[in-house]
Amino acid sequence: MERQSRVMSEKDEYQFQHQGAVELLVFNFLLILTILTIWLFKNHRFRFLHETGGAMVYGLIMGLILRYATAPTDIESGTVYDCVKLTFSPSTLLVNITDQVYEYKYKREISQHNINPHQGNAILEKMTFDPEIFFNVLLPPIIFHAGYSLKKRHFFQNLGSILTYAFLGTAISCIVIGLIMYGFVKAMIHAGQLKNGDFHFTDCLFFGSLMSATDPVTVLAIFHELHVDPDLYTLLFGESVLNDAVAIVLTYSISIYSPKENPNAFDAAAFFQSVGNFLGIFAGSFAMGSAYAIITALLTKFTKLCEFPMLETGLFFLLSWSAFLSAEAAGLTGIVAVLFCGVTQAHYTYNNLSSDSKIRTKQLFEFMNFLAENVIFCYMGLALFTFQNHIFNALFILGAFLAIFVARACNIYPLSFLLNLGRKQKIPWNFQHMMMFSGLRGAIAFALAIRNTESQPKQMMFTTTLLLVFFTVWVFGGGTTPMLTWLQIRVGVDLDENLKEDPSSQHQEANNLDKNMTKAESARLFRMWYSFDHKYLKPILTHSGPPLTTTLPEWCGPISRLLTSPQAYGEQLKEDDVECIVNQDELAINYQEQASSPCSPPARLGLDQKASPQTPGKENIYEGDLGLGGYELKLEQTLGQSQLN
């Protein structure tokens, strides 16, 4: 008997390993098909179905095959055994079965309605991912790549609008979706489709927070291929990047909302506690990600890792990943931390990397982003058939479709109207219509929904989220090109050309600045930050910028010499790069270092304003909603700076 049980155990273990290999083989096969399909689409300029939509189609087909072509097994019989001596759920449990001791580990709590009295399907159960895989493995490279590849010039040019859409717009979407869904839930209770008390207002707000996470990856990919107007691209890209971070923290804050008396009633103290949690988690995650990027910048600056590009790239990757893990370990949000880590790495650390490491890091995270995105979208297709606890409710699904469109309209149009009151370059109606159209749901909404599917309301949310992702990716993603034509939005704009950092073009832009942009207070704040960053942060963290011996007081001489790299002194003689900073009085050329660098001819900087007409299609680096007021610019020498654009 003992031998038989041991043989059965070894057989079960072999079967488990076999199922794991099948699971990996399925995803490997799906990715191969997706890559070949992407090549086919790009070769034939087929834009009505994007690669993400194709990945979902392949996932659906594979899920359909696994669902109906595999036989059910007895490994999940649904039988419940009572342990009357246990009063809690231990993390590890030793069970004596016929004098044979077995070890079991805690997996999750299961609601009564999730216990299936019939046979289960081992393959389908195996194909259902642990939700933490999405947050700990697949999402971090996607979010980091978004921050690391950020086009900083256009992003900061529209920073005010992006922050407004990301923070205020996400809050508006969450509230509007929550209110509409609460009305539909009441209708479902009245129709007898739900029991009173099964679905609370906090559940509706939770659904609103996860559905407020937009992910227009399909639209942005088409924008990039068609070279759509850079302002529209930046508004959508910037909103989606920050919106993901805000939605994740907002979802967590709502999930821990717990009034003292009635758990489903409004409690002002609990509400403000949730707001405080939101602000604290967001700020802490921002600080954590930025801190790791600063550590990476200092290590790459003061060591000679640049002589070993492989080690340099490895250190860069591991420290960036550590930002995510440290934030999660500290009870913060790793997604927010890794986003701002990527932005800070691009702004500082990238300048210290060797040329090989610059190429390797960009290609590494681009590749990881590509694989992770396609794995997620393939799994979305699979999940429609492999997830065994779907709850389809037509009224709830109809309400969700209506809610996301109304919420998107309440987000885009009123906020655009308010922003246009302070912007010189208005957000035109066709841009607003395109932003309304581009409110797709994707990886973040799906990952938030699948993270908790134990209760019936959460299962209904997950099923509805999955259908919404399918619809928006296929319909809106496929209709992007016709919509661009119908709205007469310009395409064929070379975004990279607009982002080139050459002295003559920047000086031409500076000579043609409009003096009446937006409010002067914003300009003063931005000018203070830029000056502080240029004079102190970049010289401390990178090899670029003026030597600290010229910017810090004399009594800081030892610290200045310690923190200033030898390259900064060498680059002090060069005038290869000119960068614009704000000056309140007049537009002038600053030659503070000219005494030590007599080889810098003024004519090379283009002092004759008449000889520097503005190049058509060039946008002013600072024009937008940062609020420069009537201030003008001053050109200051930047010492050998190399930025990631």
Swiss-Prot record:
Domain of life where this protein originates: Eukaryota
Enzymatic reactions: Na(+)(in) + H(+)(out) = Na(+)(out) + H(+)(in); K(+)(in) + H(+)(out) = K(+)(out) + H(+)(in)
InterPro entries given in the database record: Cation/H_exchanger_CPA1, Cation/H_exchanger_TM, NaH_exchanger, NHE-6/7/9
Residues the record marks as carrying a glycan: N96
Cytoplasmic topology ranges: 42-45, 148-164, 225-235, 299-301, 344-364, 408-429, 487-645
Effect of S438P: Normal protein expression. Fails to alkalinize endosomal lumen. Does not affect endosomal localization
Stretches in topological domain Lumenal: 1-20, 67-126, 186-203, 257-277, 386, 451-465
Chain ranges passing through the membrane: 21-41, 46-66, 127-147, 165-185, 204-224, 236-256, 278-298, 302-322, 323-343, 365-385, 387-407, 430-450, 466-486
Pfam families with a match to the protein in the record: Na_H_Exchanger
Any one GO CC term of the record: early endosome
Region annotated Disordered, chain positions: 594-622
Subcellular location: Late endosome membrane; Early endosome membrane; Recycling endosome membrane; Cell membrane
Keywords attached to this entry: Antiport, Autism, Autism spectrum disorder, Cell membrane, Chromosomal rearrangement, Cytoplasmic vesicle, Disease variant, Endosome, Glycoprotein, Ion transport, Membrane, Sodium, Sodium transport, Transmembrane, Transmembrane helix, Transport
Tissue specificity: Ubiquitously expressed in all tissues tested. Expressed at highest levels in heart and skeletal muscle, followed by placenta, kidney, and liver. Expressed in the brain, in the medulla and spinal cord.
Induction behaviour: Conditioned medium from iron-depleted astrocytes increases SLC9A9 levels in human blood-brain barrier endothelial cells (hBMVECs).
Record's bilayer topology term: Multi-pass membrane protein
Any GO MF annotation of the entry: potassium:proton antiporter activity
Entry's disease: A chromosomal aberration involving SLC9A9 has been found in a family with early-onset behavioral/developmental disorder with features of attention deficit-hyperactivity disorder and intellectual disability. Inversion inv(3)(p14:q21). The inversion disrupts DOCK3 and SLC9A9. Autism 16: A complex multifactorial, pervasive developmental disorder characterized by impairments in reciprocal social interaction and communication, restricted and stereotyped patterns of interests and activities, and the presence of developmental abnormalities by 3 years of age. Most individuals with autism also manifest moderate intellectual disability. AUTS16 can be associated with epilepsy.
Quaternary context: Homodimer; phosphatidylinositol-4,5-bisphosphate (PIP2) and phosphatidylinositol 3,4,5-trisphosphate (PIP3) could be involved in the dimer stabilization. Interacts (via the C-terminus) with RACK1. Interacts with CHP1.
Task performed by this protein: Endosomal Na(+), K(+)/H(+) antiporter. Mediates the electroneutral exchange of endosomal luminal H(+) for a cytosolic Na(+) or K(+). By facilitating proton efflux, SLC9A9 counteracts the acidity generated by vacuolar (V)-ATPase, thereby limiting luminal acidification. Regulates organellar pH and consequently, e.g., endosome maturation and endocytic trafficking of plasma membrane receptors and neurotransporters. Promotes the recycling of transferrin receptors back to the cell surface to facilitate additional iron uptake in the brain.
The protein, known as: Sodium/hydrogen exchanger 9
Recorded name of the encoding gene: SLC9A9
